Amino acid sequence: MEFSVKSGSPEKQRSACIVVGVFEPRRLSPIAEQLDKISDGYISALLRRGELEGKVGQSLLLHHVPNILSERILLIGCGKERELDERQYKQVIQKTINALNETGSMEAVCFLTELHVKGRNTYWKVRQAVETAKETLYTFDQLKSNKVELRRPLRKMVFNVPTRRELTSGERAIQHGLAIAAGIKAAKDLGNMPPNICNAAYLASQARQLADTYSQNIITRVIGEQQMKELGMNAYLAVGQGSQNESLMSVIEYKGDPNPETRPIVLVGKGLTFDSGGISIKPADSMDEMKYDMCGAATVYGVMRMAAELALPLNIIGVLAGCENMVDGRAYRPGDVLTTMSGQTVEVLNTDAEGRLVLCDTLTYVERYEPDVVIDVATLTGACVIALGHHITGLMANHNPLAHELLSASEQSGDRAWRLPLTDEFQEQLESNFADMANIGGRPGGAITAGCFLSRFTRKYSWAHLDIAGTAWRSGKAKGATGRPVALLSQFLLNRAGQNDVE
C-alpha cells in the first residue's frame, strides 16, 4: 500500500474518495463544513435526518455529492470533539481503512490527520495513521491453501496536512511509520509461525537473511551448542537439552555510527520457540500459545530491521536467544544446580521458569561488547499479566535515566509500559539452601522476582527488562502476535538517533 502527504483544500481533490470526520452529536469537522458549504448544505441535511450521529465506529459513504469533484465522501464518526484522544484517533483510522476496503475505494485522500488530538502534532498523527493502517490490513495466511483476496483493495492513501510547511514532517512520518510497521509485521510473522517450522534454526536463518538484505550495515553470527559449552553457558544449554532442536544464539550486529568509539545499544530477545514447561509441564489448555514464547526475539528482529531500513546512525546489537523447552529423558530437572556463565550457581525449583536461565547467560555474554545500555525483551512471567493485564508492558531497570527514556518512548509511541520496583526485599525471595540463588521466588511479586534474578547478571552495565507476557499476543477469536513492543523500542532508538519529531 502506498502512502503520501499533500496540502490542499478539500473541494479541489479529484479522488475516488475523500475522508472527513463528524463529531458527536452530528457536528461537522472544519473540513466537513467546507465540503458542506460547497455542496449547498447536502451533508448537514443528511445529518439532520439522523443518517449519522458521529459516534466512534460509525461511518457513512456518500456518492456523487453535488459540486464535489471526488466520486465519494466517507464520513467517519469521531466521538465528542473534546474527547478525541490517541486511542480514539487510532480507532477512527482503523474504521476508515476497513470502510474503504469494504467499499472498493482503491485510493483516498484522508483529512483526519487535520483533526485536533490533544498534545499530538502532525508528525504523530500521520505516523500513527500509517502504523494503524498497516496493522488493520495485516493477515497471516502463509499456511492457508485458500487465501481470501479482495477484488478492489485499498492501494493508495494520501494524508492531507494543514500547511505546506508541514509536508516535510509528514513525509518523514510516513518514512518512519512504514519502517516501524514493517518491523512490527516481521515480528508478528515470526510469532505466528508454528513451532514445527519456527525453531532456533529458523530464527537463525531469518537473522542471516537480514544480514544479506542489509549487507552494508549488518553482520550476523550464530553461536551453536558446542561454542556455548566452551563459553560456560550451562544454564542456557540446560533448558534446551530435552529438545531434538539445537539451541542457537543469533547475534545481529548493526553498525550505523562510523565512530569506532561509540558503544553499542544491545537488545536481547528471549527466543523460546516452544515452551512445554519441561518436567514442570504446563496445563494442556492453551499450550499451543507457547509458540509465542519467542516474541521477545521476534521483537528484537523487527527492531533491527527497522533500524537498518532507516539507516539509523547508531551501533546496535540484537541477540536472538533461540531455544526449546521440551520434556525428554535428557531434560533438566527440578533440584538441578546449574553453574551459569557468570560463575554464579542456580538451583532449579521449576523448569517452567526457563526464560530467565536462557537470558542470564545471554546477558553475561553481551558484557564483551562493553555496551552503552542493554535492554532485554521477554515473555517472562504470568505474574506480569496479573499485575498489568494485556495492555501494558512491565518495565524494570537498574538505571533510572534508561527507565525514564523507555517510559518516555512508550508514551510517545502509544506502546505503553509501566515501571515496577527492584528492591532488596524481593531479592531475598530468591535465596537457596544449595546454590547462590533459586530460579523462582514464590508467587508474591513474581514478575519482580524474575527481574531481580536477571539483575544479578547485569551489574556491569545499565540495563532494563521488558516483560511482555501480557502484551506480546492476543488469545481468543483474534488470536495472534501483536508485534509489541517493536514500536516502543523503535521510538527509543529514534530518540537516541536525534530523530524525535513527536510531541
Swiss-Prot record:
GO molecular function, one term: metalloaminopeptidase activity
InterPro entries: Leucine_aapep/pepB, Macro_dom-like, Peptidase_M17_C, Peptidase_M17_leu_NH2_pept, Peptidase_M17_N
Named cofactor requirement(s): Mn(2+)
Reaction(s) the record says it catalyses: Release of an N-terminal amino acid, Xaa-|-Yaa-, in which Xaa is preferably Leu, but may be other amino acids including Pro although not Arg or Lys, and Yaa may be Pro. Amino acid amides and methyl esters are also readily hydrolyzed, but rates on arylamides are exceedingly low; Release of an N-terminal amino acid, preferentially leucine, but not glutamic or aspartic acids
Keywords: Aminopeptidase, Cytoplasm, Hydrolase, Manganese, Metal-binding, Protease
GO terms for biological process, alphabetical: proteolysis
Gene Ontology cellular-component annotations: cytoplasm
CDD domains xref list: Peptidase_M17 (cd00433)
Positions with a binding annotation for Mn(2+) 1: D275, D352, E354
Top-level lineage group: Bacteria
Top EC category: hydrolase
Annotated compartments: Cytoplasm
Entries under Pfam families matching the protein: Peptidase_M17, Peptidase_M17_N
Residues reported in the UniProt entry to bind Mn(2+) 2: K270, D275, D293, E354
Spans traversing the lipid bilayer: none
Protein's UniProt keywords contain Hydrolase: yes
EC number: 3.4.11.1, 3.4.11.10
Primary residence: cytoplasm
Cofactor note: Binds 2 manganese ions per subunit.
Residues at the active site: K282, R356
HAMAP family according to UniProt: Cytosol_peptidase_M17
Function recorded in the entry: Presumably involved in the processing and regular turnover of intracellular proteins. Catalyzes the removal of unsubstituted N-terminal amino acids from various peptides.
PANTHER family from the UniProt entry: CYTOSOL AMINOPEPTIDASE, LEUCINE AMINOPEPTIDASE-RELATED
Family, as annotated: Belongs to the peptidase M17 family.
Listed name of the protein: Probable cytosol aminopeptidase
Species per Swiss-Prot/TrEMBL record: Pectobacterium carotovorum subsp. carotovorum (strain PC1)
